[in-house]
C-alpha cells in the first residue's frame, strides 16, 4: 500500500515527487515514457517556466540544451502572406533529456517504475492496474495524482474530460539548409484553427502543428504542402513522425483539480496556455502548490479544498490566455496587428 502514487513523470509529476519526498509518506511514481515512447513537444522553455525553475535555484546541464538558442520568432500567415518578427526569450532544449533530468532529481526514497496505468478503481483505496512490459500488476494507494497530461487516465476515469482537444502532429527532417528562421510560428486558417511551428534543433528541422482531431492527418499534409510552397523548402522526407493529443481550455470548468484523494496537476488538470500551448510552467506551479498542501495536511477533504482554492490565481491567468488567443487566432484582428507592426521588431539583413 502506497500513501501516494503519481502517474506521469514529466515536469509536473517529477516536481511533485521531489517536493513531497521529504515527508515520511510511502510514494511511487509511474511513467511510460522511454526512448521509443517520447512526448511530441517543441522543446522550448518559455520565460514563465524559467521563472518557476529559478524559485528552486535549479540549473540546466548544458547537454540538455541544443543549438541554436533563440532570440526571436518569425510569425507567418499563409493566407495573408504577412510576416513579422517578435522578440522572445526561449531556451531551445532536448525535451526528453529535460524530463529525464527532472526525474534524476527525485530522491531514492521515492520508488520509480516504468509502466502504463491501464485502469483505476476506487474501493476503500485506489486500485491501479499497471502494465509493465507484458506483465500486469495491481497497486494500492490512498492518494493518486494524475500528472499524465492530456487524456489523463485519472481524469477520464473520475472526472469530466469534455475539454476541447487538438491533435498535435510533428515531423523531424534532416536539416541541410538553415537559411530560414530558426523558430517560426505559422497561422493558416484554411487548414487549422490553431497554430503550427518550425524549429531547428541541432542537425534537425521540426515542423509541427495543432489540428482539429477530425481529418487531422489530411489537414497536416495540406498545410505542409502550403508551407513548403510559401517558404520554398522540401518537407517531403521526414526521418521521424510524432503525434499526441493536447488540451485547449476554454472555460473555468475545464480546470479540474480533483477530490476524494484523486488529484490532477499540469495539463491533466487543464493547466496549459490556450494561446501558446505552453504547459511546463503550469505543470511546475500546480505541482508545487499541491506538494505544499500535501506536506502540511493529511485530511483528504482539507487537501481538496486548499488545492482548489490555491490554484484560483493560476486558473485566472490561464483564462486570460483564452482571451489572448482570440486576438491571436481571429484572422482579421491578427492581420490588423501584423499590419500595424504592434510589438514587432525589425530584422536587419
Question: Residue ranges of each PLM-predicted region?
Answer:
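Glycine-rich FAD pyrophosphate-binding loop
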Residues: 5, 9, 21-41
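FAD/FMN-dependent oxidoreductases across multiple families
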Residues: 119, 215-290, 299
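Conserved FAD-binding catalytic core of PHBH/FMO-like flavoproteins
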Residues: 143, 151-218
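Conserved N-terminal glycine-rich FAD pyrophosphate-binding loop of Rossmann-like flavoproteins
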Residues: 33-56
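Conserved N-terminal helical subregion
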Residues: 51-62, 69-156, 164-166
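C-terminal helical "tail/cap" subdomain of flavin- and related membrane-associated enzymes
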Residues: 292-349
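N-terminal Rossmann-fold NAD(P) dinucleotide-binding loop
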Residues: 13-14
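Redox-cofactor binding/interface segments in oxidoreductases and associated redox assembly factors
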Residues: 7, 146-147, 264
Amino acid at each position: 500500500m502506497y500513501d501516494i502514487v503519481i502517474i506521469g513523470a514529466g515536469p509536473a509529476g517529477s516536481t511533485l515527487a521531489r517536493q513531497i519526498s521529504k515527508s515520511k509518506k510511502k510514494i511511487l511514481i509511474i511513467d511510460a515514457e522511454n526512448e521509443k515512447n517520447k512526448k511530441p513537444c517543441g522543446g522550448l522553455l518559455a520565460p514563465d517556466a524559467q521563472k518557476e525553475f529559478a524559485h528552486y535555484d535549479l540549473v540546466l546541464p548544458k547537454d540538455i540544451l541544443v543549438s541554436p538558442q533563440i532570440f526571436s520568432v518569425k510569425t507567418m500567415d499563409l493566407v495573408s502572406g504577412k510576416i513579422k518578427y517578435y522578440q522572445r526569450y526561449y531556451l531551445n532544449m532536448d525535451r526528453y533529456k529535460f524530463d529525464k533530468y527532472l526525474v534524476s532529481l527525485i530522491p531514492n526514497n521515492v520508488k520509480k517504475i516504468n509502466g502504463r496505468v491501464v485502469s483505476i478503481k476506487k474501493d476503500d483505496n485506489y486500485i491501479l492496474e499497471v502494465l509493465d512490459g507484458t506483465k500486469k500488476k495491481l497497486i494500492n494507494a490512498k492518494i493518486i495524482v494524475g500528472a499524465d497530461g492530456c487524456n489523463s487516465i485519472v481524469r477520464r476515469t473520475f472526472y469530466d474530460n469534455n475539454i476541447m482537444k487538438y491533435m498535435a502532429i510533428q515531423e523531424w527532417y534532416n536539416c541541410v539548409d538553415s537559411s530560414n528562421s530558426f523558430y517560426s510560428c505559422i497561422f493558416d486558417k484554411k487548414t487549422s484553427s490553431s497554430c503550427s511551428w518550425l524549429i531547428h534543433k541541432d542537425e534537425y528541422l521540426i515542423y509541427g502543428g495543432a489540428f482539429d482531431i477530425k481529418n487531422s492527418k489530411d489537414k497536416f499534409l495540406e498545410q505542409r504542402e502550403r508551407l513548403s510552397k510559401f517558404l520554398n523548402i522540401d518537407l517531403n522526407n521526414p526521418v521521424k513522425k510524432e503525434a499526441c493529443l493536447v488540451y485547449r481550455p476554454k472555460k473555468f470548468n475545464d480546470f479540474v483539480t480533483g477530490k476524494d484523494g484523486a488529484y490532477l496537476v499540469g495539463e491533466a488538470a487543464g493547466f496549459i496556455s490556450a494561446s501558446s500551448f505552453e504547459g511546463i510552467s503550469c505543470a511546475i506551479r500546480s505541482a508545487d502548490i499541491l506538494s505544499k498542501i500535501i506536506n502540511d495536511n493529511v485530511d483528504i477533504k482539507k487537501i481538496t479544498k486548499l488545492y482548489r482554492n490555491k490554484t484560483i490565481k493560476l486558473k485566472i491567468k490561464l483564462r486570460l490566455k483564452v482571451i489572448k488567443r482570440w486576438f491571436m487566432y481571429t484572422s482579421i484582428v491578427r492581420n490588423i496587428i501584423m499590419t500595424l507592426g504592434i510589438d514587432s521588431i525589425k530584422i536587419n539583413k
